[in-house]
Amino acid sequence: MLALRPLISALIVVSSATPLIGAPDAAGNFRAAVATVDITPSANKWLAGYPARKSTGIHDHIFHRIVALDDGRTQFFLISSDLCLFAPSVYDEMTAQLKRETGIEPIQVWWTVTHTHSAPEVGPHGLLKLMMPERYNHEPDQEYTALVEKLLIDGIKEARAKLAPARLAVGTGFSAANINRRARDVNGHISLGLNPDGPTDRQIGLIRLEHPDGTPIALIANYSMHGTALGPENTLITGDVPGTVAAYVEQKIGAPMLFINGAAGNLAPIYTVQPSFNAFHITEFDVLLGDRILAANNSLAMGTSQVRLRPSESVVETPRRAGLGWDKSLGNYLHAASGEAGTIRMPVRFLFINDEVALWSAPVELFCEISINVRDHSPYPHTFYFGYANGWLGYLPTRQAFAEGGYETQTNPFTEQVENDLTNVVIAYLEGHAR
């Protein structure tokens, strides 16, 4: 069993950029493109993330932002959608239709969400209804779900059609825009709140796609933070902090920015669950996070056109919590005989870029300590975790958090064994594929 490294309360990351060493057999063949598709509904919708409530208007529009990558042999598509979450069956349905229309395989597609809690519900309620039935006494919105899926497929086709010669650069930055949200009382009771002494991950992971002349195609910014600056009283559709910061950075650089959430399971924005936009200035995050992304971008070295992409997948099998039911649409994610709790089959995706960058993703709300531990043990100079990817199977807390209790330890189908099961598989996979 892999020992977990002790963590300090905040990970201090100095802005840095490591030039990528090009892959000789893919020299100069790299192409990239981006597409942005508006998915703002025209009617009021049930909003995800808090107790059931319907939208009453629109504060800012929400989008699919789609990047297409092509190294001459492999194409890969990364999506950031201004949504809260969706069941893995939605991803499976969308990618099956995408394959029928385009031949693109699911392994080539990562569909992440920013986790804003002020966007419409998408897809069947899945595990959420088993864990929080009081929130889901209404029917899923099949019409909006179908629209979101269609617009995404259209956007992937658009990005693919626009592929053009490009370069890729990678680096990191730092932002103190997040805070641990597992507040601890004098009696040790854990509740949702703010805990400035708790673990955080404040690294910004950055990937820049640029034209051969150096002008930007798109920026991919990876940062860990719940999309909960607005609380349940807000009923206006909004991208929350991720959408606000993306729009700010886009205005500054003249190109789209994909906000890719990270291990935000126990991390909140430092200004959180505000009742309305009148109660605070959400644009403060343009300074706290947006300007830090821009500074990290300015520190990146010139990108390389010598890029090799290696997408792959592993499956983590881990025990299911006893007494928890299962959603019939998620049969592919559970292995169990009749009457047994069985094991959950959690897909973990990887994308290796040359020999310097490892991206990994999972359909969970991961605690930041786990992502940091993987990064510390990774043989790659840059290891970024892309969270909320390809569906949602619940929170994935640490073993210590399971012992302490709290909201996240009940809103998942796992046992306290899951941290070690995931960590051991991911680190072994990274070590086994290092070159």
Placement of each model-derived feature along the sequence:
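Cell wall/extracellular polymer interaction/catalysis modules
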Residues: I293
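Bacterial N-terminal signal peptides
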Residues: R5-P19
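N-terminal secretory signal peptides that target proteins for export/translocation
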Residues: M1-A3
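Anionic-ligand-binding alpha/beta catalytic cores of soluble enzymes and soluble regulatory domains
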Residues: L289-G290
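Conserved beta-alpha junction segments in alpha/beta enzyme cores
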Residues: A23-T112, T116-L258, G262-A264, I270-V273, ...
